[in-house]
């Protein structure tokens, strides 16, 4: 893609040099980043000062697809933020769209994820002869099918579930509501649990909690974590786990099977695409491993 200069880029860099004594290397890097972004915007018929948050996020996704490193993208965002602060100060724009874009977190460890075989073993671990086992199987199926946060899962109530349409109405961070499809397997196990195991678990006690504890109350995060570790031991999984292991597996497996990053972002309830992007590194690493193992020239 051709990089396109813009007079505002030169004005910004001149102002930055006068104010902060910008080094030649930083000046060249900022110019290159902003010119590349301007060229990308031109292909989308948008002028540089008119770039909004959504377009900036789209460009970040494009950079990721092109193989740009997180440190390079962090430098680009740093320059872009300075550029829009300059435009705002000069009254050339009304708002700074970069305020709503998070910086990439450098050096952040990749989320722990399980293989699809590990997930299958974990899902089959609960004892279905017991009500608590039926609850746990349905709970794990829903968690893996929907990629919920643990707090979202344990706080689910009956009125948030639509089995006929196969969707959950989830209340996420910041009281933001989203609809998440469950898939056929999760619906089947949830129907079975609600028909049999849940009533036995409650033993006549009233509750609108979808996955109640043995006392009929909302399950705590600690109890959920205890159940996950128990089932992992039963399944023979000795990999490091976290309460969000199945959420990470949900995102990674979707991307491994070709899901669009934006779709995964919406399903996870991430407000910013950069939060979702870290999963693409996990997915790409797995794909590279498979290529090396199975391709004749790997």
From Swiss-Prot:
Location of the Tyr recombinase domain:
109-292
Q: Listed GO cellular component terms? A: cytoplasm
Query: Which gene is annotated as encoding this protein in its UniProt record?
Result: xerD
Main localization is cytoplasm
What does the UniProt keyword field contain? Cell cycle, Cell division, Chromosome partition, Cytoplasm, DNA integration, DNA recombination, DNA-binding
Originating organism: Pseudomonas putida (strain ATCC 47054 / DSM 6125 / CFBP 8728 / NCIMB 11950 / KT2440)
- What family is this protein classified in? Belongs to the 'phage' integrase family. XerD subfamily.
Quaternary structure, per UniProt, is: Forms a cyclic heterotetrameric complex composed of two molecules of XerC and two molecules of XerD.
Task: Note the superkingdom of the native organism.
Answer: Bacteria
- What biological-process GO terms show up in the record? cell division; chromosome segregation; DNA transposition
According to its UniProt record, where is this protein located?
Cytoplasm
Catalytic residues identified in the record:
149, 173, 244, 247, 270, 279
Summarizing the function annotation, the protein's role is:
Site-specific tyrosine recombinase, which acts by catalyzing the cutting and rejoining of the recombining DNA molecules. The XerC-XerD complex is essential to convert dimers of the bacterial chromosome into monomers to permit their segregation at cell division. It also contributes to the segregational stability of plasmids.
Taking every annotated instance into account, which residue ranges of this chain make up the domain Core-binding (CB)?
A: 3-88
Looking up PROSITE patterns in the UniProt record yields:
CB, TYR_RECOMBINASE
Q: What is this protein called?
A: Tyrosine recombinase XerD
NCBIfam families attached to this UniProt entry: PRK00283.1, recomb_XerD
InterPro entries, A to Z: CB (IPR044068), DNA_brk_join_enz (IPR011010), Integrase-like_cat_sf (IPR013762), Integrase_catalytic (IPR002104), Integrase_recombinase_N (IPR010998), Integrase_SAM-like_N (IPR004107), Recomb_XerD (IPR011932), Tyrosine_recombinase_XerC/XerD (IPR023009)
Q: Which GO terms describe its molecular function?
A: DNA binding; tyrosine-based site-specific recombinase activity
């Amino acid at each position: 893609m051709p990089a396109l200069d813009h007079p505002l880029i030169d004005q910004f860099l001149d102002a930055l040099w006068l104010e902060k004594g910008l080094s030649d290397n930083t000046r060249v890097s900022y110019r290159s980043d902003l010119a590349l972004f301007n060229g990308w915007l031109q292909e989308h018929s948008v002028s540089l000062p008119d770039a909004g948050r959504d377009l900036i996020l789209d460009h970040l996704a494009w950079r990721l697809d092109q193989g740009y490193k997180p440190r390079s993208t962090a430098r680009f965002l740093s320059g872009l933020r300075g550029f829009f602060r300059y435009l705002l100060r000069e009254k050339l724009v009304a708002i700074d769209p970069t305020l709503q874009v998070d910086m990439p977190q450098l050096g952040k460890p990749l989320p722990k994820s399980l293989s699809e075989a590990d997930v299958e073993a974990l899902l089959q671990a609960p004892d279905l002869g017991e009500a608590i086992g039926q609850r746990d199987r349905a709970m794990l199926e829903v968690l893996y099918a929907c990629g919920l946060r643990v707090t979202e899962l344990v706080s689910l109530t009956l009125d948030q579930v639509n089995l006929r349409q196969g969707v959950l109405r989830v209340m996420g961070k910041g009281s933001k509501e989203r609809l998440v499809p469950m898939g056929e397997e999760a619906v089947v196990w949830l129907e079975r649990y609600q028909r049999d195991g849940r009533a036995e678990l409650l033993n006549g006690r009233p509750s609108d909690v979808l996955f109640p504890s043995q006392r009929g109350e909302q399950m705590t995060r600690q109890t959920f974590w205890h159940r996950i570790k128990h089932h992992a031991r039963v399944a023979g999984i000795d990999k490091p786990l976290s309460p969000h292991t199945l959420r990470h597996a949900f995102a990674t497996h979707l991307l491994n099977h070709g899901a669009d990053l934006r779709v995964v972002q919406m399903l996870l309830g991430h407000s910013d695409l950069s939060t979702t992007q870290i999963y693409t590194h996990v997915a790409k690493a797995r794909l590279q491993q498979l290529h090396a193992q199975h391709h004749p020239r790997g």
